[in-house]
Structures are given as C-alpha cells and as structure tokens.
C-alpha cells in the first residue's frame, strides 16, 4: 500500500467519524480550533501545517492548508520540514497534532521561524505529558510516548529511520517545551519567544473517545461538561491535562531575525 493510499484511507475514516459524532466536532471547533484562532496574529497570511482531513479549513477557509499528501480539500502539498514559502512572508503558522509526528521537529520549528514575518506566530495544539496523560498515552493510545527521545537533533536516527508517515511520539512537544527544556529549544530558535504554553483538555475529550466510533458523552451533555472543565482547569492542568496550547512569536527586532532563505521558494499568493 502506497503512502498516498494509506493516507486517503486514514483521512476518509476520520472524515466519516467526524460526520457521525457531533460532540467530537464541537470539541474540536469550540476548544481546539478556537484556541488556535484566538492565539494567532490578526490579518496577513496564515498557513496550516498537517491539514489532513480538512476540518480546520472548513472553519477557517482563508487559511492556506498544507500536508505531505495531496487531497482535493488541501491547497498545497508541502513537507513541514522544508516549507516551500519565501522568508518572512507568512503571518501565522498553525497546526493541530503535527509536531509529534515529524521525524525532525527542530527542522520544522526552524522553517516556521524562517517564513514568519516579524511579529508573526507559530501556534500549535499538541499532546502534553502530565502524570495522568502519560498513563493514557502509554497504555491506551496507539502512538508511542517515549520520553527518552532526543528531538533537538536535526537528524535523529532513532526517529527518522524506518518512520512511517502516521507514526508519532506524543512526548515530543513536552520534551521540547516543558519547563526544564524550553530554554534549550529556544536557544536554537533565536528569533522566537514562547508567549504561551498552556496545558488544557481532559473530561470532554476522554469521554468522547476521540476518533473512535463509540462515545460516552452525548452532545446534549457537552456544554455542561465543557463548562465544568473550564472552571476546574486550574485544579488539574499541571497533573492531568492531555494537551497544550503553544504559541511562539517571532521577534520584531530585525537584528535578532535570521537572514537565511531556502532559495527558490515561491512567493505566497492569497
């Protein structure tokens, strides 16, 4: 089975479940996508990395949606680790569940730093490691949760060799941006400052079972569960949150910004 065929089947399955589970749509649109949109810089050009099944594009149609695989609902076929956009031309780089799937996540972060305009933002929603989420991800999720990985290496043989397109290590975002490692990561990204690292997400997503066919959360109960989750967030975010909102802003000081370009990149068109 080719990677394109595998991807089409994967996306088709997700699109089918998306249509069948209104509570899942509400969680994504009112929690995950809403956090991405509320944290971006207004105006300008926004691109989505890992557009996949096209759910975010439906909510935010002006975004330039990209993925490694060609799909009718996506705008650009692009490798997140070698983006085909000119330096300092993009206002926002947005992504949901992308960073932990990449073979060389630091290459992507450097590419985002390169293509963003001064004041532009990289905004991501990713898995996050807490004492509770580590149990969930390690024992109840199909993707790896390997805290021994070294994501700062631009070419990590332990990650890159033999990696399939949909393989993931849900520990990667925490390893890069957890409090103990954040400065190490930012030292390799001199134009970036981390303006948000906000853990969230618990009850509603767990009860919905995500992209599995079953759900323990009827849509009619979602508003109450969502309200409870928001009100109680300060009590559990440090030890039980499943996800994190990350926002990195590129410095407006031209003396800080890198002057690198990938050469041959085409200018963006609205």
Question: Language-model segments: which ranges?
Answer:
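A conserved beta-strand element that flanks and buttresses the S-adenosyl-L-methionine
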Residues: 94
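A C-terminal cap/extension of S-adenosyl-L-methionine-dependent methyltransferases
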Residues: 183, 187-190, 194-270
